[in-house]
Amino acid sequence: MTEVLSQDEIDQLLTAISSGDASIEDARPISDTRKITLYDFRRPDKFSKEQMRTLSLMHETFARLTTTSLSAQLRSMVHVHVASVDQLTYEEFIRSIPTPSTLAVITMDPLKGNAVLEVDPSITFSIIDRLFGGTGQAAKVQRDLTDIENSVMEGVIVRILANVRESWTQVIDLRPRLGQIETNPQFAQIVPPSEMVVLVTLETKVGEEEGMMNFCIPYITIEPIISKLSSQFWFSSVRRSSTTQYMGVLRDKLSTVDMDVVAEVGSLRLSVRDILGLRVGDIIRLHDTHVGDPFVLSIGNRKKFLCQPGVVGKKIAAQILERIESTSQEDFEELSADEEELYE
């Protein structure tokens, strides 16, 4: 309630202002600096900011994988990157799509419900032209796909879905499958118009053609795994899978590396003068080696086994006798499995 000043209080206030003892600024009401956020009850937010960031990270991986796979398939420069990740109603998404367009309805097994992958017409026709042997220039007319073009796009989308599965691995073992391809957005009603969805918009460039791909996923589809869409869960999963994946790749690469295997008769120390004086026919006496002693078999400059020299057919060979230092039993059995009779 507003306070009413008496005449004496008014006179005192006017006197203070005229004498400079009180500032006019002090009499002004203090403005409210609190930030007010608008909230639309017709479209409540279903995803937190952290969950949206996690979805963005997941689909950045998807964008990189798709860039690589499409570039290899089309033999052309393809670039895909995440432009935005938003939440909106399904009706708003449908209204934003041109007609005709390429809409792939995708089952998200084991999650319930479907998702939609929408490919801009300019990108669709650029891909088709490239696969048909052209330069990748998109058609300038808006039309539906022919049966052959539709079949070609099915193959491309199936390949893209493999990237979706890979990018979701940290959260769930997703097995997305292509249901059907629609060209009219009104025929792709996967959820009620008012249902909230997350829309991942991907800027796509095929050759010189630029356009968009949109991946639309309903909230009811993601809801069972919503707790896993956290930064902590995501990064811990990435570290675990990365370690396992990289160890497997490292093991595969190392298994194909060529190693030097040397059977050493013996060794001794010589002066530089003696080495420079060596001639063909000279005999070098190995003081610490006797006739019949086993050779030392070194692998990658590390002494691993004792072996016996001999021949197999017309080839010089060495038979492994025993290990020198710690080598796994599996490696030893593999090296000594194919023993053949050796002749001195």
Curated annotation (Swiss-Prot):
Keywords: Bacterial flagellum, Cell inner membrane, Cell membrane, Chemotaxis, Flagellar rotation, Membrane
GO CC annotations, alphabetized: bacterial-type flagellum basal body; plasma membrane
Subcellular location as annotated: Cell inner membrane; Bacterial flagellum basal body
GO MF entry, a single one: cytoskeletal motor activity
Biological process according to GO: bacterial-type flagellum-dependent swarming motility; positive chemotaxis
Family matches, as Pfam families: FliM, FliMN_C
Topology in the lipid bilayer: Peripheral membrane protein
Major location category of this protein: membrane
Domain of life: Bacteria
Job of this protein: FliM is one of three proteins (FliG, FliN, FliM) that forms the rotor-mounted switch complex (C ring), located at the base of the basal body. This complex interacts with the CheY and CheZ chemotaxis proteins, in addition to contacting components of the motor that determine the direction of flagellar rotation.
Assigned protein family: Belongs to the FliM family.
PANTHER family (UniProt xref): FLAGELLAR MOTOR SWITCH PROTEIN FLIM, YOP PROTEINS TRANSLOCATION PROTEIN Q
Descriptive protein name: Flagellar motor switch protein FliM
Organism: Treponema pallidum (strain Nichols)
